[in-house]
């Protein structure tokens, strides 16, 4: 069921991941698409993964306890003046995702909806489905979105945190690089 769940979305930067029988979904979008994505999906939880998280207003329909802001730059190695994704960041993301009750959708966003958010969504898919093959998930992402470019550092940290023994990084290699775009396009991944 790749590519069909968000056909009604007017904004080109939303992604949905179906998470199982009850059909809760993880929607991934850009900052620009956040209000519309939350409104259209009825999401109860929002995960913000970007620099300058203070600029992100929590959608009024989302409770303060259900909005996690994780401040990190979209970089793959330590750089002066930037905040590299860290083990602490990934622990926060994974704990938040595991605490989501799946009663209503979760929205994960970064600035453009291409790198940090898709990496966090990939990590969430692996965390919520520990027996699902990483390459299968990555191939579905690539098939659904030629521009998805999950941040390799985030994926590597999640791989270690989830005990995937490098399989998530090998899945990124299998996935290949994304096409260059300013913002992401909609796509759907079935989790199980």
Each model region followed by its residue ranges:
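Amphipathic alpha-helical interface surfaces
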Residues: 89-93, 106, 116, 120-121, ...
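N-terminal polybasic/positive-inside topogenic patches
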Residues: 3, 7-15
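Glycine-rich, flexible N-terminal cofactor/catalytic loop recognition
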Residues: 20-63
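PTP/DSP superfamily signal
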Residues: 100-105, 126-192
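Catalytic cysteine-centered active loop of the rhodanese-like fold, especially the PTP/DSP P-loop
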Residues: 98-128
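Helix-loop module immediately N-terminal to the HCX5R catalytic loop
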Residues: 72-106
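Intrinsically disordered, low-complexity regulatory segments
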Residues: 66-74, 183-184, 192
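Active-site donor-binding loop signature of nucleotide-sugar glycosyltransferases
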Residues: 5, 51, 70-74
């Amino acid at each position: 069921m790749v590519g069909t769940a968000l056909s009604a979305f007017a904004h080109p930067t939303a992604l949905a991941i179906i998470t199982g029988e009850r059909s809760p979904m993880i929607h991934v979008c850009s900052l620009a698409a956040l209000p519309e994505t939350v409104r259209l999906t009825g999401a109860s939880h929002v995960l913000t993964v970007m620099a300058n998280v203070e600029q992100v207003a929590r959608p009024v329909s989302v409770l303060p306890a259900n909005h996690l802001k994780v401040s990190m730059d979209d970089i793959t190695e330590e750089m002066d003046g930037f905040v590299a994704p860290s083990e602490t960041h990934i622990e926060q993301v994974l704990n938040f995702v595991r605490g989501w009750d799946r009663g209503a959708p979760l929205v994960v966003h970064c600035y453009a909806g291409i790198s940090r958010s898709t990496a966090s969504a990939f990590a969430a898919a692996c965390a919520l489905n520990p027996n699902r093959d990483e390459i299968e998930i990555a191939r579905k992402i690539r098939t659904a979105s030629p521009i998805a470019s999950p941040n390799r550092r985030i994926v590597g940290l999640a791989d270690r945190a989830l005990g995937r023994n490098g399989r998530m990084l090998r899945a990124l290699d299998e996935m290949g690089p994304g096409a260059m775009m300013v913002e992401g396009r909609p796509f759907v991944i079935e989790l199980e």
